[in-house]
């Protein structure tokens, strides 16, 4: 079934088994499916609940909240915060201006660019944070590598440890950050895996 709507329309949909997709620019969107994929180009504030299925949104003008039992989640540039709960599958976020929170049981987590704080935890998988410039970062995994990119001009306070793995701090040592410097506080822990902190 195909429905034509004016640009910026608010959309909600629920199906038991089937895919939901939207092209062009939509307004606020709320979708729910028991089994099926959700694919959007551009939406306003977004909420998606699916028991099994992939979720893709190329861009979100507002906050994004995604829940999936099993599936891959990919969110493009988001003008707001992002919250993802993904029990089984990888999660990829291009960029977010607000806070990012991701919880996963089995899957890798990747955030290319974070404009605020990040909390990402997975039981089995690696976590990569491409760039963070401010706020608080908390990363944790039982089995997997952690990688954190600190933006140029940002001072970092680090509290990181790996029970079985190498910790590499590639940042230059400094004494105290200037009052005008951006600061990020990083807490990262992995039981089995390496940790790398670098400039982005």
Feature map (PLM): residue ranges:
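Intrinsically disordered, low-complexity terminal regions
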Residues: 1-200
